[in-house]
Curated annotation (Swiss-Prot):
Function, as annotated: Acts as a replication initiation factor that brings together the MCM2-7 helicase and the DNA polymerase alpha/primase complex in order to initiate DNA replication. Additionally, plays a role in preventing DNA damage during replication.
Name this polypeptide is given: Protein MCM10 homolog
Source organism of the structure: Danio rerio
GO biological process: DNA damage response; DNA replication initiation
Gene that encodes the chain: mcm10
Ranges where the record places region Disordered: 18-208, 502-589
Gene3D superfamilies: Nucleic acid-binding proteins
Renumbered residue ranges of the record's region OB-fold domain: 202-360
């Protein structure tokens, strides 16, 4: 059954090859030989991956022989084909015999892997396309030659070019070395037509992608960075060898100035917009492309596609870089100055690749929508209308990028508000009138502030007021429960009530005394205190002498024994007055002392007669023994005589120490410093030390990536800021809206209030604003070709064109600051004439 299927498959393949051979001469006769077009050999119509380019070259070399033999195959007769079929049948029988023999010897575990690999190789995308068998004109019918042919035929996984239909694509492939086939089922799978489902090939390894930060080369002729290039730089140079390049932004001027009909010229552009295909009166469809070269974003060109050009190219995506060969200019519409071009053949348009720098502005409009202005992402990410605002926004973030700015407002770290907040706390008086410090705020109303403690306490009626008013009705249970809890509010109320009670009592004991009476009272109190102090000291001395072993109270009182009493209480202590002072509970000098205790402030040194208990006990013991202590003379010179034994021991120790030092010095002389240094160098140069020195962590690459990422995050904003500066420096003029008042005869960016109020004859129109600068540094923006007046700073009329951003000048060197003639005075010396 398998042999019949194989024969049917071979017959169908031969029939298809005959049909293709019959169609190929007609196709070759119908081809046009266009010498002045880009793609004579149909290059560049299909995108080819870099890996597939080499494989395609090998495939083309292998397909040369089948292409040459196509003319000879047409002359074959049916008898020759039948003979070839018989030959193929014999070969298939031999192959089947070899498969049966190899199936017995092959281990079972190798079958799934080989079968999986062969099935994957047959499910490539090219399998779904029309296939043709290899030519079978070899005299050698060995299986090795057939497997070699099958192996050499399968090389690529991409789809064949649509235009080159005469190319033949093999049906089978094998990634291993030529060897006998192992399974009959595998032969059937190779001879059967594969399914049409496109699956990616698994034999080829994935293409290594470029890193993100790797620079992409700029194409020579278009000046743009390309993504997925269709042609190599060498092919583009060959096509541009005898042709002249004209920039798209310069094309309107060149067409108006020069005659380009006789020359062979090319322009490159990017498709920035595609208008929906439209129909003409005769029913034919055409399309319009908007083109720009991304170097001058103000110059756009329209390309009209008619007939076959529209049929072949209308699916081209936006952002594609194309080259146009000798386009024909068209007449402009009435009131339109935009240049329009057209081409008469599809091969006059060369698709190069995709523009990597094609994009739109990333800023937002005032209404919140995204900006749709065209930008070159390599130069700047913002259009000329938003770049200045973004530059100011990025410049305001300098503190966040290059300092330790925390984001908190200054002056609020210690509870201080801003100057406005501090001024707005109260009114101010000026000129005899009172006014608010600040105007009322237009912001949302602030929440109501909580009442302060003073206001809450003032609202609580005191006990005295309630008693006087006769409104005491008792305390409620809820209030009593709240007051019993140790909350801050309850404690504050209790403290307030206690202070009011004490202040009332203290106020009733105040008496008026004259100055002389007050001095007399103070003098009497002082004398009483001194007398009480002396009596107290005498009593203490008597107690000490009577109780010999008992501890003696010091003449200076111990402050830590209790709270102190007032001087008045101390003076009344010896008199035996037991009544306590009645007065306000205010801090006193003797706080903490009990009633009747004394405080002695006698700072005089103690008398020599008074001895401590320990000294008295020692004196009594000496008297009992009968010994007497002789008093030493303090003026006598004391000298302690050393013991002879100590001296001899010290001498022996010094001798032993000297011997040890001599031995050490001798050993040091034997090993000089050079020898030690040599040993150290030998250790440093040893393998062990070098291995320790060169040892690194296995995760050191992670630190490198982190540092690189940190550097990129730091420098990326600076690079973007520099790009914005360069873009603003390059902008010399901008389109804008202006107003012209015919009554007042002026043109400005907005109308004056007087013109609006009096309803003058003014109208809005499109204008161009230009930037100028004076040698003195003054800048001016003007809507005319040149400013009408002189410089307001220096009085000169020497205006020069300048960019949107003022040029930043660095520090000047000494030669620039040197003025040999001194400071110039043009108004007096006329030095500028």
């Amino acid at each position: 059954m398998t042999e019949e299927e194989n024969l049917d498959m071979l017959l169908s393949l031969f029939a298809e090859s005959e049909g293709q051979d019959l169609e190929s001469p007609a196709a070759e006769e119908g081809e046009d030989n266009l010498d002045d077009l880009f793609d004579e050999d149909d290059d560049g119509e299909q995108y080819i991956e870099p890996e597939e380019a080499e494989e395609e070259k090998e495939e083309e070399e292998e397909e040369v022989s089948p292409g040459k033999s196509s003319s000879s195959d047409l002359n074959k007769s049916k008898e020759d084909l039948e003979a070839e079929l018989k030959l193929m049948q014999e070969k298939m029988q031999k192959l089947q015999q070899q498969l049966e023999a190899s199936q017995k010897t092959t281990p079972a575990q190798n079958k799934p892997a080989v079968q999986r690999q062969s099935t994957k190789s047959l499910t490539s995308p090219q399998a779904g396309v029309k296939t043709t068998p290899p030519t079978v004109r070899d005299s050698d019918g060995s299986p090795s030659n057939i497997t070699a042919k099958l192996k050499n035929k399968q090389r690529t996984a991409h789809q064949p070019k649509a235009a080159s239909s005469e190319r033949q694509i093999p049906i089978g492939q094998s990634t291993n070395q030529p060897q006998p086939m192992r399974d009959g089922a595998k032969v059937n799978s190779m001879l059967k037509s594969p399914p049409l489902i496109k699956t990616p090939p698994t034999v080829r390894q994935p293409t290594p992608r470029l890193p993100v930060n790797q620079e992409v080369a700029v194409e020579k002729f278009s000046g743009l960075r390309l993504r997925k290039p269709r042609l190599s730089s060498i092919d583009i140079e060959q096509k541009m060898a005898s042709r002249k390049l004209i920039r798209l932004s310069q094309l309107p001027d060149r067409l108006a100035r020069d005659n380009l009909e006789d020359s062979d010229w090319v322009t490159f552009a990017v498709i920035i917009n595609k208008i929906t295909p439209q129909s003409k009166n005769n029913g034919k469809t055409f399309s319009i492309w908007k083109l720009n070269d991304l170097h001058n974003l103000e110059v756009n060109v329209s390309l009209f596609l008619f007939g076959s050009v529209h049929t072949d190219l209308w699916k081209t995506d936006t952002g594609t870089v194309i080259g146009i060969l000798n386009p024909n200019p068209m007449k402009n519409k009435e009131g339109s100055n935009e240049l329009s071009l057209t081409v008469d053949h599809p091969q006059k348009v060369l698709i190069i690749g995709e523009a990597m720098d094609f994009g739109t502005c990333k800023a937002k409009k005032k209404n919140g929508d995204s900006c749709t202005q065209l930008v070159n992402l390599y130069e700047c990410q913002f259009c000329q209308y938003h770049v200045k605002a973004q530059y100011k926004k990025m410049s305001s973030k300098r503190a966040e990028l290059q300092s330790s700015f925390t984001g908190s407002a200054p002056g609020k770290g210690r509870g201080r508000g801003s100057l406005k907040e501090r001024l707005c706390q109260s009114d101010f008086h000026y000129g005899g009138m009172s006014s608010l410090a600040c105007a009322p705020s237009m912001s949302a109303p602030q929440p109501k502030k909580q009442p302060t403690i003073q206001s809450a306490l003032a609202s609580i009626p005191t006990k005295k007021l309630v008693l006087n008013s006769g409104q005491v009705s008792g305390c409620s249970d809820d209030f009593r429960g709240l007051m019993s809890m140790p909350t801050p509010g309850a404690l504050n109320i209790k403290r307030h009530l206690g202070q009011s009670k004490s202040s009332a009592v203290a106020g009733s004991s105040v008496q008026s005394v004259s100055a002389s009476d007050l001095l007399k009272q103070q003098k009497e109190q002082h004398q009483q205190r001194m007398m009480a102090r002396k009596k107290r000291a005498e009593e203490i001395q008597k107690r000490v002498l009577q109780s010999g072993g008992a501890p003696v109270a010091s003449s200076r009182p111990n402050v830590s024994r209790g709270p102190l009493l007032s001087p008045k209480a101390a003076s009344e202590g010896p008199k035996g007055s037991g009544s306590s002072l009645s007065g306000p509970a205010v801090p006193t000098l003797g706080r903490g002392f009990s009633e009747g205790e004394d405080i002695v402030f006698d700072m005089s040194p103690p008398s020599s007669k008074s001895l401590s208990a320990t000294k008295l006990a020692a004196v009594r013991k000496l008297q009992a023994k009968g010994s007497v202590i002789v008093k030493e003379d303090p003026n006598a010179v004391k000298r302690k005589r050393a013991n002879s034994g100590d001296i001899t021991g010290r001498v022996e120790r010094n001798i032993v120490k000297a011997k040890v030092t001599d031995e050490n010095s001798a050993s040091e002389e034997e090993e000089p410093a050079m020898k030690k240094r040599r040993e150290q160098l030998e250790y440093i140069q040893s393998e062990e030390f070098q291995r320790i020195l060169n040892a690194k962590s296995s995760n050191s690459w992670m630190m490198g990536e982190i540092e690189e990422r940190a550097m990129q995050e730091y420098f990326e904003p600076l690079v973007q800021k520099e790009k914005m500066e360069e873009k603003m420096k390059s902008i010399r003029e901008m389109k804008c809206r202006a107003v012209t008042c015919k009554t007042c005869k002026y043109t400005h960016f907005k109308p004056a209030d007087r013109c609006v109020e009096e309803k003058h004859d003014y109208h809005w129109h499109d204008a161009v604003k230009r930037f100028f600068k004076c040698p003195c540094g003054q800048r001016k923006i003007c809507l005319a070709r040149m400013p009408h007046g002189a410089c307001s700073h220096c009085g000169l009329f020497k205006w020069e064109r300048d960019g949107m951003l003022k040029e930043k000048k660095g520090p000047k060197i000494g030669g620039e600051l040197l003025m040999p003639r001194g400071e110039e005075q043009p108004k007096f010396l006329n030095s500028l004439k």
